[in-house]
Amino acid sequence: MSFLWSLGSFIIAIAVLVSVHEYGHFWAARKCGIKVHRFSIGFGKVIWKRIDKYGTEFAVSMIPLGGYVKMLDGRNEVVPAEQKSQAFDSKSVLQRSFVIIAGPLANFIFAIFAYWVIYLYGMPTVKPVIESITPNSIAAQAHIEPNTQILTIDGEETQDWETINMLLATKMGEPNVEISLSPFNSNIEQQRTLNLTNWTFDPEKESAFEALGIMPMRPKIEMVLSKVVQNSPAEKAGLQIGDKILKENLTALPWQDFIKQVEQGESFSIKVERNGETFDKVLTPVRNQNGKWFVGVSPALTKLADEYRTELKYGILESLQKGIEKTGQLSLLTLKILGKLLTGDLSLNNLSGPISIAKGAGASANIGLVYFLSFMALISVNLGIMNLFPLPVLDGGHLVFLTMEAVKGKPVSERVQSICYRIGAALLLSLTVFALFNDFLRL
């Protein structure tokens, strides 16, 4: 069921974002008087189509992992004399550049719109209050203390942990990052400076703030079982809701330690407390439908006190402003991470492919529509930036060729473009295969 949910959420997200991107190209082409043959969502066999009064075929194709806009172009077909003025290649460099850049621009506009809707509706979140500081960490060296709330980072307001994570990630390598804090529920401000010159982190394994040693206030996990899955190893071993899992010394077993034992995939013994009595049980993990080891239990969570919770909700104009700011932060973060990948400061193992995106889509959709919309905004920004990358098969590569044409006064030769396209396609395919390989390693 979780696989189908993730797959369905992924298809919806990709279909919407590809439609937005391709509509940007389509809209700009129409504005420039270019004839559009086909607007397709997906590749492969056409499963639905409709032709409008301008002769454009709108189609939905079998493979929902992309899309395209096919325009009248003298480089690819014989153009009738009466239609030459409607061909893409007959337009000025400026007009063609506008058509190319309109796709990524549409993705950024979608992200702004999505965050505008999110902030209008209201997004529940947790205040950025620090629960603890890891000893000898960068945060500890900066004398940041527990039970303080992060107010700003280099002057930018921080109302939630997601914003903090993004801002800190963009500060990687900077020697002086100013953080403003205050003791929780106090008006006294404190200033601290982080030295991030030699700091790097793995975004697949931890958040930026946790890598710095900042542990957020979050719901407490109690080793009292709140759920036992039917026909699971836990139920077969006789575990029940309300059972307390203990260490050998009869103290509570931390949930993370319990998970580590499960992930080893071997039988292990636990002590269980029930109705004042203590006894031993043996659990034998099995693999679930996602290939991960599990025993079929969930712990109870102590609800986070209301004083630590808030809702990000604003008026119409302020929501728009926040949407623009958030999209800008995401764009800067994406560019920084791309830069770190190119310089080797971040491992290419952090690249994610469609499987990771599908899992993220399913998880966010499972939490709620607001979170799914936020996830789509994030992917839309990434899609916009990646398409502007100067690789010949991408929009950015087309813009490079058009820039060279504007400088030289004539188009780049078909032969050079063809060679560049082949190299670009090979590089893009290699990155896609590598990202897929990373996805499989994470399963």
From Swiss-Prot:
Residues 106-185, 198-287 form the PDZ domain. InterPro entries: PDZ (IPR001478), PDZ_sf (IPR036034), Pept_M50_Zn (IPR004387), Peptidase_M50 (IPR008915). GO terms for molecular function: metal ion binding; metalloendopeptidase activity. It holds the Pfam family Peptidase_M50. Disulfide bonds: none annotated. Keywords: Cell inner membrane, Cell membrane, Hydrolase, Membrane, Metal-binding, Metalloprotease, Protease, Repeat, Transmembrane, Transmembrane helix, Zinc. It is a multi-pass membrane protein. It is found in: Cell inner membrane. Its EC number is 3.4.24.-. It is an enzyme of class 3 (hydrolase). The active site is at E22. GO terms for biological process: proteolysis. The chain crosses the membrane at residues 98-118, 369-389, 423-443. Zn(2+) binds at H21, H25. Its cofactor is Zn(2+). GO terms for cellular component: plasma membrane. Interacts with RseA. A site-2 regulated intramembrane protease (S2P) that cleaves a peptide bond in the transmembrane region of RseA. Part of a regulated intramembrane proteolysis (RIP) cascade. Acts on DegS-cleaved RseA to release the cytoplasmic domain of RseA. This provides the cell with sigma-E (RpoE) activity through the proteolysis of RseA. Belongs to the peptidase M50B family. Regulated intramembrane proteolysis (RIP) occurs when an extracytoplasmic signal triggers a concerted proteolytic cascade to transmit information and elicit cellular responses. A membrane-spanning regulatory substrate protein is first cut extracytoplasmically (site-1 protease, S1P), then within the membrane itself (site-2 protease, S2P, this enzyme), while cytoplasmic proteases finish degrading the regulatory protein, liberating the effector protein. NCBIfam families: PRK10779.1, RIP metalloprotease RseP. PANTHER family: MEMBRANE METALLOPROTEASE ARASP2, CHLOROPLASTIC-RELATED, REGULATOR OF SIGMA-E PROTEASE RSEP. The 2 circularly premutated PDZ domains act to negatively regulate protease action on intact RseA. This is Regulator of sigma E protease.
